[in-house]
């Protein structure tokens, strides 16, 4: 985080004026294994323009995400537009220094600057695109990490996408 950021414990009245690009959301902060994670929901139009993805195919030295699959994103958008359907799982993000992410414990307010590339998508790029392409303007459940370097973001992406166990085919047949 930028050294210009006020402390998360600093009272709001002592914080410097924020610019018109500042966004504030009610959030819950947890500290897990040395990492701060903030859980909230953000309207897609406040999230999508300020998020970015480091794709391996576009940047082999620093990228770690899969190639964008428009068909998959459109399928998600169609699903989200269907009455009674929802996606409860969150999109995992990493606040970049430019986001100037701050959290006020007393009011449970999470703030970040609306600037390009403020939030790196660690997991959920196709869900994010699906929300963006959907004709309905949903609020998106997110988990936002702060203070991660790019190597940690990549490791977290790999952990999320390789260490979970899929549902056995037999169980899928029974549930359907």
Residue ranges and their predicted role:
Residues 1-88, 97-102:
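N-terminal extension/subdomain marker
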Residues 3-11, 65, 84-89, 93, ...:
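Basic- and aromatic-enriched surface patches that contact anionic nucleotides/nucleic acids
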